Amino acid sequence: MNERDRRIIDVIRALRDGEVVTYGDIAEDAGYPKMSRLVGRILATTDEELPWWRVVNSVGRLVPGHEREQAAQLRSEGVKVSDGRVRNARYGRFS
């Protein structure tokens, strides 16, 4: 794994319960502000156990095809979800 991917994974791994951020937030925090699509690719392809459910698109939409599972995970952490979007998180962009 290259250094760029490792930095992105480290940022994702550090997300707290109830924290919801965007792909762009992760990319920026890892030092690659223009690489939000790479964050999605890493989440979709890595074998590492990561809290993928805490990452959403720029308007708070859940991951297509995984909405039910993602919403359940987020709700278990105290995040409000309705109509396929994060409405209120404990921490992060949508708090």
Question: Across the structure, where does each feature detected by a protein language model lie?
Answer:
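Nucleic acid-binding interface residues in structured DNA/RNA-binding domains
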Residues: 1-95
